[in-house]
């Protein structure tokens, strides 16, 4: 167990997928972040080994940039937080090794952070939310959750691929590029009609893999690409709205916070604002600069965890490629309600 006063500076390391990013938090305030993103060759998805090689090259450059840009005194750093999972194994390991080496050099503890929890916490921090229903949507997550009994409890989730990944896969196959969500939405603007899509919702859970397959079949049948794009995103977003609406009705929450990279979607915002109005819930979206993977969210969540005594010796660092959101203790949850 590490003992301390209030931590002064926390450095956060994010490396779960295509982005390597370092973030900085001081006294619970986000100071900023730096990052680089691996962009796969056209027509290909993320290759874990190539992403890891990208991260390994980017790490020392970004560390120097962080120190210089924010005038960090390394003597003030109290802990190093890192994204321990879930994510791509090779990419996670690069971040963990870098964080461990930095912690050893500085003589400070490590704070392992759950990537999904970090998305939620940066959204709560940035929107000033206390006890919201959370919709976490990104390339790796599609979860509707709320806090109960010390953890985020899942009220609905994808049964296969995440919404961002599903749309990215479609975009890649039809040549729209990466990242796929904004590219597909841009293409959809040229369409004035929709075609019917299946809406696979099982109870409170969703299935997105079939939407990608169905959309590709429509393209092969000669349906105009903008029409398929518009139909795909409308269906995918209304599926989210359906399970979110049910969760709001069940939990009676009066705040809905939307986190993750797909939260940038303007069309999705229109749909979810309407859901909020119908249920008397205020809908808040994470700011765009914190929507995608970033080191600031790791540093911030690491700060909260460290204040609650959550830390490990550098030699005890670990990564978990699979790690459910609802298995993580969140003892700091109500600290944000007393700011």
UniProtKB/Swiss-Prot annotation:
Its cofactor is Fe(2+). PANTHER family: TRNA N6-ADENOSINE THREONYLCARBAMOYLTRANSFERASE. It catalyses: L-threonylcarbamoyladenylate + adenosine(37) in tRNA = N(6)-L-threonylcarbamoyladenosine(37) in tRNA + AMP + H(+). Binds 1 Fe(2+) ion per subunit. Substrate binds at residues 136-140, 168, 185, 265. Its EC number is 2.3.1.234. One of its GO terms (biological process) is tRNA threonylcarbamoyladenosine modification. Fe cation binds at residues 115, 119, 293. It comes from Pyrobaculum calidifontis (strain DSM 21063 / JCM 11548 / VA1). Keywords: Acyltransferase, Cytoplasm, Iron, Metal-binding, Transferase, tRNA processing. Required for the formation of a threonylcarbamoyl group on adenosine at position 37 (t(6)A37) in tRNAs that read codons beginning with adenine. Is probably involved in the transfer of the threonylcarbamoyl moiety of threonylcarbamoyl-AMP (TC-AMP) to the N6 group of A37. It is found in: Cytoplasm. PROSITE patterns: GLYCOPROTEASE (PS01016). This is tRNA N6-adenosine threonylcarbamoyltransferase. Transmembrane segments: none annotated.
């Amino acid at each position: 167990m590490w003992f301390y006063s209030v931590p002064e500076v926390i450095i956060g390391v994010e490396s779960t997928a295509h982005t390597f990013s370092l973030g900085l938090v001081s006294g619970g305030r986000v100071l900023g972040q730096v990052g680089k993103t691996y962009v796969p060759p056209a027509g290909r998805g993320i290759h874990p080994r190539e992403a890891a090689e990208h991260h390994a090259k980017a790490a020392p450059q970004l560390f120097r940039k962080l120190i210089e840009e924010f005038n960090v005194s390394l003597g003030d750093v109290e802990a190093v937080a890192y994204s321990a999972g879930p994510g791509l194994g090779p990419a996670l390991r690069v971040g963990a090794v870098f964080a461990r080496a930095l912690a050893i050099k500085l003589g400070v503890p490590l704070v392992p952070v759950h990537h999904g929890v970090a998305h939620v916490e940066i959204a709560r921090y940035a929107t000033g939310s206390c006890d919201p229903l959370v919709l976490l949507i990104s390339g790796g997550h599609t979860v509707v959750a709320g806090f109960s009994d010390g953890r985020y409890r899942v009220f609905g989730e994808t049964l296969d691929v995440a919404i961002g990944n599903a749309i990215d896969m479609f975009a890649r196959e039809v040549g729209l590029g990466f990242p796929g969500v904004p590219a597909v939405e841009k293409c959809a603007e040229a369409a004035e009609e929709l075609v019917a899509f299946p809406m696979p919702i099982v109870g409170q859970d969703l299935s997105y893999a079939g939407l990608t397959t169905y959309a590709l079949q429509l393209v092969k049948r000669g349906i105009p690409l903008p029409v398929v794009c518009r139909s795909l995103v409308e269906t995918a977003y209304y599926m989210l709205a359906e399970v979110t609406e049910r969760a709001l009705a069940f939990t009676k929450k009066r705040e809905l916070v939307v986190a993750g990279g797909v939260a940038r979607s303007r069309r999705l915002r229109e749909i979810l604002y309407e859901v909020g109005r119908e249920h008397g819930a205020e809908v808040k979206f994470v700011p765009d600069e914190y929507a995608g993977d970033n080191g600031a969210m790791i540093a911030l969540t690491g700060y909260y965890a460290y204040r609650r005594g959550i830390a490990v010796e550098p030699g005890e660092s670990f990564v978990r490629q699979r790690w459910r959101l609802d298995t993580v203790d969140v003892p700091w949850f109500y600290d944000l309600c007393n700011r």
